[in-house]
């Protein structure tokens, strides 16, 4: 059986305003919008085009997706998922596993600490040395971790992806 390499992009939302009527309603700052746009340009230049975009339904994640997609030049409709807003690592991983097998590239935009935990736990330790070193220094706002995933999304496990790139958007 031939293995298919898929691409998984995990992103922490961009810089958001410190307050709003509720945490869920916090919007991006101007810097956050610029950072997400730059991260999108970086991903677009790398040739990434998502077949699925799974995004938290929080305002700051929605804004991050809009700027990211704009910067990359993507015309992809995001799937906004309320459960990703407060998901722990196990729940987030379950959401990734639900991705249709026809999807070659999956982009996920969510929140810390979950995005950082999932990225660190998926890493098989055999990835790009510079990317691994950069990710080990932290997962700030607008951080993007790119992984190669062998096999079906449904079989994705901790330690089951190779980190190929890490970038922090700076607009």
Range-by-range predicted roles:
Residues 46-48, 99-104:
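Glycine-rich phosphate-binding loop signature in dinucleotide/nucleotide-binding domains
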């Amino acid at each position: 059986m031939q293995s298919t390499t898929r691409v998984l992009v995990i992103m922490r939302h961009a810089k958001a305003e410190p307050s709003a009527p509720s945490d869920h309603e916090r919007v991006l700052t101007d810097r956050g919008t610029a950072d997400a746009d730059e991260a999108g340009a970086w991903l677009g230049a790398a040739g990434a085009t998502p077949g699925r975009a799974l995004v938290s339904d929080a305002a700051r994640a929605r804004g991050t997706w809009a700027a990211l997609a704009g910067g990359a030049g993507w015309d992809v409709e995001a799937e906004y998922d309320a459960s990703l807003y407060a998901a722990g690592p196990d729940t987030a991983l379950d959401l990734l596993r639900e991705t249709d097998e026809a999807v070659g590239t999956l982009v996920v935009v969510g929140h810390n600490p979950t995005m950082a935990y999932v990225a660190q736990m998926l890493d098989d330790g055999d990835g790009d040395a510079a990317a691994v070193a950069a990710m080990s220094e932290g997962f700030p706002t607008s951080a993007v971790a790119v992984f190669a995933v062998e096999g079906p999304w449904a079989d994705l496990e901790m330690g089951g992806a190779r980190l190929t790139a890490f970038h922090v958007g700076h607009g």
